[in-house]
Each structure stands twice: as C-alpha cells, then as structure tokens.
Amino acid sequence: MDLAGEHISLMDTTLRDGEQTQGVSFTPSEKMNIAKALLQRVGVDRLEIASARISQGEQEAVQNIADWASGQGFLDRVEVLGFCDHKRSVDWIFDSGARVLNLLTKGSENHCKNQLRKTLEEHAADIRLTVEYAQSRGLKVNIYLEDWSNGYRDKP
C-alpha cells in the first residue's frame, strides 16, 4: 500500500495466529483458499502461514501453499514462524518449500531468565546460530522480539 509516497507493508497472520483462537482450525484446503485470497485478491505483502514443527499435516499444508506460491511468484511473500532451535525449525521450513523464517526470539531479560533459563548473551548466541544456519540454507530471516517493549522499559 502506498500512502503519500511511502510504502506501508501489510502482513497477515490469520493462518498462523488465527488458528490459535479457541475453536479455530483450518483444513489444508481452507488454508490454501485463504492464502490465495490474501495474496491475489487482497494483495497483502507478507503472509505468515504456520508455525514450524507443529505437525506433519501442517507441514503438508505449508508445502502445498509454497508450491502454489512459487508458481505464482509469491514465494518470497510466504513466511513461517520458527524458533531458536538451531537447525530444527530451519530444516522444517526449508523442507516445506518456504523460504522466509520469522524467528521468534525473546526481547526482554525477564523472558530470557524466566522462560528460557538463559542469559541475554546465551540467547543472543542461540539467535546468531539459528540465523547463520538459516542463511546458509538460503532462507531470508525476520526477527520477532517477544516482550520487547517491557524489556526496553525495564532495561533500556
């Protein structure tokens, strides 16, 4: 979307985050139809379609969408949420045919200490390891900083 000469990038997470809503579960064909509508008719710039390593069925849905998106020239707009687990999420995404990893990381010392039981430095090393591996496999990487605003407030 262009607004006064500036481009605003629209990202939709319905196929990943929407499925976390109680009682919501999309079939693979529903996911495909939603992906096609969002990319072709709505024209979203980015579409996060799944979380890595959820299930074999989810991987098959990602493969189907990635295959279709590749044929339509949309593959660089199809993204999958992954985790700081070095090779596991990266390989799952790569094997699914997707080429963009949205890496979920911790954005606060509190989350590092209390959820991961790691220091900021240890988590940063995990992030680097995962990003370097993803790039070596040819994936583009976006980084999500979970709880960043609280982390910044608590320790700018």
Q: Which positions does each model-derived feature cover?
A:
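Active-site mouth loops of central-metabolism enzymes
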Residues: 10-32, 77-86, 112-121, 144-156
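Non-cysteine beta-strand/loop elements that form the S-adenosyl-L-methionine
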Residues: 11-13, 98-109, 142
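Conserved, mostly hydrophobic/aromatic
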Residues: 18, 38, 101, 143
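Structured alpha-helical segments in the cores of large, soluble enzyme domains
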Residues: 31-39, 93, 123-137, 156
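Catalytic cores of alpha/beta
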Residues: 86-95
